[in-house]
Amino acid sequence: MLHTTQRLCCSAHHNNNDFLFMRVITGTLKGRHFDVPRSFKARPTTDFAKENLFNVVRAYIDFEDDCEALDLFTGTGSISLELVSRGCKRVISVEKEPLHYTFINKIAKELKAEQWLPLRGDVFKYITRCGEKFNFVFADPPYALKELATIPDLVFEHNLLKDDGLFVLEHGKDYDFSEHPNFVEHRHYGSVNFSFFKNKGEE
C-alpha cells in the first residue's frame, strides 16, 4: 500500500540550478514530484518518451494483473515509480551507482511501497544469478556502455521473461536490433529509442 509523502517526475524540467524536476505520469502516484540532483550521472527518460512508451507497453502487459516487473539500470527510479504507480504486484530495481541506489531506496521507504524492492548491484551479475521470471523487464543502460548490444541475448539466455512477458531496451540511435530473433518492434521519440522483445512464438 502506498502512503505518498512526496512527488516524483520523469521529465527534464528545471526547478533550480541544482536539481532536475521529475514527475509520475499515471496511476496512484500521478502528479507526484521529486527533485533529482543534477550531479547524478543518470538522467530521467523524458515525459514525452515515457508516456508514449507506456502507451505501447499496455498493449502487451496488464500491470494490474499480478504483474511482476524488473527495472535494470534503474538510474533515478522514474520507470520503477511508473510501474509501482500503475499497480504492479512487485517491482525489483537494480542499480549499481551508490548515489542513485540511495536516492531510489529512500523514495521507496518514504512511499511505504512494500511491493518495490531496490537492489544495489551490478546488472550483469544480477542477470546471471537472478533465477526468476518476470512479466515485464525494462533496461536503460548508459548509451555508451560497451556491453549494451549484449543485453537482449542475456535476458533470453537467462530466461528472465515469463512465457508472455515483454522486454524493452532503451538505447541510442546507433543500435539496430531488428535482426534479433526475439525482436518485436522499435519506437523512437526524439533522441530516445526503445526496442521491444518477446519470447519466440509470442506475439
Model-derived regions: residue spans:
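Class I S-adenosyl-L-methionine-dependent methyltransferase catalytic core
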Residues: 2-203
